[in-house]
């Protein structure tokens, strides 16, 4: 029973965390109901398979997959460029399928030549801590907007939705801090489904759309055979490198979260295996027209909140996602979960991640505090600052630059890596000079 409830909790969390992206992309490309359903289905089918493969043969951690925010940005950018780069929305989607296949090859090559292993060494505690803080800051805007009901039933703040979301948040926090283990471990599941019932009772839930078939597998190249555009190829190579940075950060923070509980990681480094698994998930995404997934750091918050680091419920939950994705009625049912409920639960989950960031900073000796603080200042100023740059200011730039300059999380993390490595290089150089002088 514990395994089943844990699996259902993971399933609900995975779907709630991922449903927004394919729906938003479908709207950007003005897809009809049939094509929208196909995009949503293939995306969940792939992310479920990706999570299982990663947990078994990749990074070997309970990290749920979600459509990559970087790819979401690329899809949105190229939807706006339709008519300029590609003639139609269909051609643009075919070009994006080609970009995912190129990315799959890049993941494979970077894993074969052990580039991923070298990148993993750059994630020192200060870089990981900065990444966590920036993650919470970047997600704070959509989470708060979702809780306020903006864009759910109306464009402005929805008082009813906001009130109901506050009830869900309060209930989730109470259960998370409860002395009753059942409520503590299943707080996310209870909050999601309890919130759903609450919204339905208040008339704020959306109806479930009835499908026209009982079973449906994703189709091969649903938007047509892939197109390979030189600009998209360059973009996909750059995006792959950024996704590796994102993936390594997620592995690091979940590893930290698991060390706080009984389930200890095996101590081995699986970065290359994770890269090969990501290559497969991008290949599958390109073949089925899905939005490629990436391991997300929210899993650390989930583990912190539920105190459940076991892989078995996660594996079963991911398998349930795969099953749900091929049964349209189940997919439509879960897709009708009120988005403010998901945002309310994510508020609780991600609030736990700020503490993980400061724990990373505290792991340094007192003598390092000045260096660490300077890195934090540089990276936060860079990452948070870029979050306030309006998207309209980036129009006309190459999609590669737009992808970087519109993502404060990635840019701030890269700034932290650069500042950290530069200061470590200066210290090594200084130590070598002192050592040479002492010899003479």
Swiss-Prot record:
Record keywords, A-Z: Cell membrane, Membrane, Transmembrane, Transmembrane helix, Transport
GO biological process, one term: xanthine transport
Membrane-spanning parts: 3-23, 39-59, 67-87, 96-116, 130-150, 156-176, 188-208, 231-251, 283-303, 314-334, 341-361, 374-394, 399-419
One annotated Gene Ontology cellular component of this protein: plasma membrane
Membrane-related topology note: Multi-pass membrane protein
Expression induction or repression: Negatively regulated by TnrA under nitrogen-limited conditions.
InterPro entries membership: NCS2 (IPR006043), Xan_ur_permease (IPR006042)
Subcellular location, principal: membrane
Cellular localization per UniProt: Cell membrane
Annotated PROSITE patterns: XANTH_URACIL_PERMASE
GO molecular function: xanthine transmembrane transporter activity
NCBIfam families, alphabetized: NCS2_1
Record family assignment: Belongs to the nucleobase:cation symporter-2 (NCS2) (TC 2.A.40) family.
Protein name as annotated: Putative purine permease YwdJ
């Amino acid at each position: 029973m514990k395994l089943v409830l844990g699996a259902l909790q993971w399933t609900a969390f995975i779907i709630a965390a991922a449903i927004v992206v394919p729906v938003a992309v479908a709207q950007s490309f003005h897809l009809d109901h049939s094509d929208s359903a196909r995009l949503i289905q293939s995306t969940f089918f792939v992310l479920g398979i990706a999570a299982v493969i990663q947990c078994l043969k990749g990074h070997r951690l309970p990290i749920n997959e979600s459509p990559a925010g970087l790819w979401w940005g690329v899809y949105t950018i190229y939807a706006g460029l339709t008519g300029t780069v590609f003639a139609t929305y269909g051609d643009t989607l075919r070009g994006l399928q080609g970009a995912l296949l190129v990315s799959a090859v890049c993941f494979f090559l970077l894993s074969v030549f052990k580039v991923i292993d070298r990148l993993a060494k750059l994630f020192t505690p200060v870089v990981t801590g900065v990444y966590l803080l920036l993650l919470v800051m970047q997600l704070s805007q959509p989470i708060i907007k979702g809780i306020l009901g903006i864009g759910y039933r109306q464009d402005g703040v929805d008082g009813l939705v906001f009130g109901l979301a506050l009830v869900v948040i309060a209930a989730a926090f109470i259960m998370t801090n409860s002395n009753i283990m059942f409520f503590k471990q299943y707080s996310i599941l209870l909050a999601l489904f309890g919130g759903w019932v609450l919204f339905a009772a208040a008339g704020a839930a959306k109806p479930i759309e009835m499908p026209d078939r009982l079973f449906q597998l994703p189709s091969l190249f649903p938007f047509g055979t892939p197109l390979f555009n030189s600009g998209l190829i360059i973009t996909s190579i750059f995006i792959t490198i950024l996704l590796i940075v994102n993936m390594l950060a997620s592995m690091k923070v979940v590893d930290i979260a698991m060390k706080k509980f009984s389930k200890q990681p095996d101590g081995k480094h699986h970065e290359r295996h994770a890269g090969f698994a990501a290559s497969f998930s991008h290949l599958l995404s390109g073949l089925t027209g899905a939005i490629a997934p990436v391991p997300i750091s929210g899993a650390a918050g989930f583990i912190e909140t539920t105190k459940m680091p076991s892989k078995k419920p996660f594996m079963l939950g991911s398998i349930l996602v795969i099953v749900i994705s091929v049964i349209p009625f189940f997919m439509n049912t879960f897709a009708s979960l009120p988005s403010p409920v998901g945002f309310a639960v994510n508020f609780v989950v991600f609030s736990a991640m700020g503490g993980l960031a400061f724990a990373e900073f505290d792991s340094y000796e007192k003598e390092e505090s000045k260096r660490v603080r300077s890195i934090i200042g540089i990276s936060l100023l860079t990452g948070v600052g870029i979050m306030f740059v309006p998207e309209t200011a980036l129009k006309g730039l190459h999609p590669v630059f737009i992808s970087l300059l519109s993502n404060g999380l990635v840019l701030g993390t890269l700034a932290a890596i650069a500042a950290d490595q530069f200061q470590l290089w200066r210290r090594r150089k200084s130590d070598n000079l002192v050592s040479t002088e002492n010899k003479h």
